[in-house]
Amino acid sequence: MLINKDLINSFVNITSKAAIEAFKFVGMKNKIMADKAAVDIMREELNKLDIDGKIVIGEGELDEAPMLYIGEKLGSGKGMSIDIAVDPVEGTNFVANNLPGGLSVIAIAERDHLFNAPETYMDKIAINKNIPSDAVDLDNSIRDNILNIAEARNKDVSKVRACILDRPRHKRIIDELSDLKVKLKLLSDGDIAGALLVTDDKYDVDIFLGIGGGPEGVLAASALDAFGCKFQGRFIFETEEDIKRAKTMGIKDLNKKYELNEIIKGESVFCATGITNSDLVKGVTTVNNEFVTESFVTYKNSFKNVINNTYPKLD
């Protein structure tokens, strides 16, 4: 896929504008309006591009419009054929309650190179590229994974830090990690950002694990791929409807453990713009009469950067 700086900047512009629109609802206790504002501007800006775009990960099916729905065509239809994954507001509760962690996220890849994930849960594990890829596995015990990381990092188990969503479903895992004396970083929401904390030692996270959204797993995998990190995911289907939908999307082995190169095939671009502050990027701010945004951007192995943009306040 021919990716150039102008195209990358176009997607940075899209998530930046979506973040700004959501930012206008920060602290207003209305996550639905924040999400809708981000969706509307994201659709508007995507349709301005000379691309033949198709949503493969969005916010629902066709009958749930005006969300960016799975299968929706975007762009002029005259340019390159690309798959698009979006999460216009990752952490809607963060935005509604003016808490850290709100992001606007998009990932793109050549047509059929971005996994079309069903709207269901995924068991995930991600580690830094400096840890051997065979050190952890979804099929290993928690204890074995942690001990292997400690050995690979040449540090005591008590110095290993694990990041996981603070959910009742994770009580057993959290208890086991605590028994091992592992340092914990518990997240109330936002498992895209959580997974990306393994990309750099400055975040002091050795492993991200646990059950979160399947679509969010694919979005995170796009960025993790650029950093050479390890990621595994296995979908969890709770209802017959989940299974039926997965099969219609081409998933045959319901227990399959997906490796990173099966989720992201070839080149991909990932962009996340902060709405509220997070470990990854700063949230939207206002300086004089302008909005200032900060975006976390990756493109395969060739481009990893934090980009700042300014936009005039028009209202």
Protein language model annotation of sequence segments:
Residues L74-G75, S104-A107, D204-F208:
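Short basic, glycine-rich beta-strand/loop surfaces that mediate nucleic-acid
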Residues G79-E90, F94-F115:
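DPxDG-like acidic metal-binding loop motif
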Residues D139-T298:
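An extended, acidic
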Residues K5-I8, K29, N93, P132-D134, ...:
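A short glycine/serine-rich beta->alpha loop
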Residues A109-E110, L114-T120, L187, R234-E238:
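Short, acidic/small-residue loops that bind anionic groups at enzyme active sites
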Residues I55-E59, I84-V86, V95-N97, N116-A117, ...:
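General beta-strand structural signal in soluble alpha/beta enzymes
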Residues R111-I149:
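Glycine-rich phosphate-binding loop plus the immediately following alpha-helix
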Residues M1-A85, D144-L147, E151, S178, ...:
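N-terminal subdomain of lithium-sensitive/metallo-dependent phosphomonoesterases centered on the IMPase/IPPase/PAP
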